[in-house]
From Swiss-Prot:
Gene3D superfamilies: PurM-like C-terminal domain (3.90.650.10), PurM-like, N-terminal domain (3.30.1330.10). This is Selenide, water dikinase. One of its GO terms (biological process) is selenocysteine biosynthetic process. Keywords: ATP-binding, Kinase, Magnesium, Metal-binding, Nucleotide-binding, Selenium, Transferase. It holds the Pfam family AIRS_C. The record marks 49 as: Important for catalytic activity. Changing residue 46 to A: Loss of catalytic activity. The gene is SPS2. Homodimer. The active site is at 46.
Length: 398
């Protein structure tokens, strides 16, 4: 039996207006009925990242290396010895990302993997990726038949999102590994005017916008527990949150994770964004802190703090987090997101609201939220802290 997938129409360009995530049917692929890709890994999605403090310590050593540019933010930005037809200097903007499976369906995992790789380019206000490479590990824990099918489906899903982003996969590397792995490299050659650097423009009074809800890590774990019950599920979740609520949460989260941030990249430039980052493995507060810290270096350093006042979260993820004593730190702002939204700074509430309205109109009706502001950092601020949750911050349940 063939495993048919919905095809995007020619007019679709952003990954939000295609059909909803199809229900995973392993048997239709020739896999055992009980097959789940997440059985072959213990770490999921962007939660596999090295803890942020350890990573930043390593990056400090790397940043001291002569010739390194923009180390530590979402993309590498390297000046080229070429100009465009207008005589403007060109830059190679590149990024790489990969992770272990977070969902059961290998095709969907490929889609999410590609969307996540592209997101770093999009956080630079670059909507057009020139080329992608695919990085893939096939699991040695599967039998040969399962390995062939899952690898094929992951590659198909990755390539489908690349096509939706109007780019192509031109190379990569495939290896064997106990845990499956999917990711890649995204590259674009642009002029200064064609990107929004994450540093240099941010200032006190800027308004912060988030383009996707939070709670994906909670969603994928609840889904796995629904299929493979754990003691925590039995103790804290069963009897409090229904299987139907978990399925709804999972479907909302996977639709969000596979949705491209491409339109957000295009519109942030149009509406005069001062900078952005994407929210992934360190959680929104971790990435906001990194964004704020990046302003304190460079030619015009600023000591700023990003204040998060209201956060959109999947409602069932909020309920589950409260039942589990916030095991994944969603309510603290540190829950890992996979292929999360863009956190964008705008010079005014008017610009931020216009961005949100237009993005909803062109991105399949998906909302964005004004979530906070930028302020001058207190002179007695704790060393290394450049972002905070406002006391009693508002949770917007989605």
């Amino acid at each position: 039996m063939s495993h048919k997938r919905p095809q995007s129409s020619a007019g679709e360009s952003n990954g939000a207006v295609d059909l909803k995530t199809p229900r995973f049917d392993p048997v239709s692929l020739g896999l055992p009925a009980e097959f789940q890709l997440t059985d072959y890994t213990r770490l999921k999605g962007c939660s596999c990242k090295l803890p942020q403090p350890k990573l930043l310590a390593l990056l400090q050593e790397l940043s001291a290396t002569p010739g390194q540019k923009d180390v530590g933010m979402d993309c590498s930005i390297v000046p080229l010895h070429h100009t465009n037809s207008k005589g403007e200097a060109l830059f190679l903007v590149s990024t790489t990302d990969f992770f272990f499976p977070s969902v059961s369906d290998p095709f969907l995992q490929g889609q999410i993997g590609a969307a996540n790789v592209l997101s770093d380019l999009y956080s630079m206000g670059i909507p057009d990726c020139d080329t992608m490479l695919m990085l893939l590990a096939a699991s040695t824990e599967m039998d040969e038949h399962e390995r062939l099918i899952t690898t094929r489906e992951i590659m198909k899903g990755f390539a489908e999102r690349a096509r939706l982003a109007t780019t192509t996969v031109t190379g990569g590397q495939t290896v064997m590994n106990p845990w499956p792995l999917i990711g890649g490299v995204a590259m674009a050659v642009v002029s200064e005017a064609e990107m929004v650097r994450p540093t240099g423009l941010l200032c006190a009074g800027d308004i912060l916008v988030l383009t996707k809800p939070l709670g994906c890590q909670v969603a994928v774990n609840l889904k796995q527990w629904l299929l493979r019950p754990s003691p925590l599920y039995e103790e804290a979740i069963a009897g409090h949150i229904s299987p139907e609520e978990i399925e709804e949460l999972y479907n909302m989260a996977t639709d969000s994770m596979r949705r491209l941030n491409r339109e957000g990249a295009r519109l942030m430039r149009k509406h005069g964004a001062h900078g952005a980052t994407d929210v992934t493995g360190f959680g929104i507060l971790g990435h906001a802190n990194n964004f704020g810290a990046a302003q304190a270096v460079g030619d015009a350093p600023r000591s700023l703090c990003l204040v998060l006042e209201r956060l959109p979260m999947f409602k069932t993820a909020v309920a589950a987090s409260k039942q589990m004593n916030d095991k994944y730190r969603l309510l603290e702002g540190y829950s890992a997101e996979t292929s999360g939204g863009l956190l964008v700074a705008f010079p005014s509430t008017t610009a931020a609201a216009a961005f949100c309205a237009e993005l909803t109109a062109v991105d399949g009706g998906c909302p964005s939220w004004i979530v906070g502001h930028v302020e001058d950092r207190a002179t007695n601020a704790v060393d290394g802290v450049y972002a905070r949750l406002k006391d009693g911050y508002e949770i917007v349940e989605v």
